[in-house]
Amino acid sequence: MNETIDYNDQIIDSVPLDNLLPRIYEKMDSNITIHNYSESGDGNCQNFASAGDATGRGISSILTLDLLEDNFSFNADHILSNWATVYASGDVMLLAESAWNSWWFWGDEGIGNNEMTNIHAFDISSPGQTDYIASGRINGTIQDQFSLSEYNGNIRVCSTTGQWGRWWMEDPEPMVSHVSVLGLNSEGTVYEVIGHVGGIAEGEQIWSARFIGDIYLNKYIFQETLPLLLVHLTF
């Protein structure tokens, strides 16, 4: 068995990186040009980023194109991730993806990263270019792109934990919501939680959310009522 695994590992290691990545096909008249996603054809992967404990099997890519150029070219950055939710402000783009690659946690008493969300930030302030900034992780899962915000250099997120209704557990944690604020650490390499309000609206699910200036607004759906929650996020 070990010999088979070693043999398969050798085959995988010998495959060029570009053979494993998506490509862009440009057609001009009858000519087709293939563009690689890596920085160069020799398998350079410097424009790819991945969480140290990533479980995602896909690639989320940000492509920047100049539609006025005579010759087709693009700037690209990539995250190895699960299916991502995208948010963008004027200067920052966020990709938020589940830290776990499956929604099914049956029998998993040690939840671990199942309800965690990875958030990857990119600088889009320069036209025609994207630059990876850093990533962070928050507790809970998000509803949609309106659950995300970038404001004054910080990332703001509303999330929910326990919404999967773990019916197989005898006494599961109740469903609650959270508002988290993330800021870059002193080295500028990781987004860390610098503010958090948790335990919000026990037993209720986020229906919609908005961040407006220093204010976070949230609606929950519970039976036939729609309570509205406001949180002031000034530091």
Go through the PLM ranges and name each one.
Residues 1-235:
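Beta-sheet-rich non-transmembrane sensory/scaffold domains
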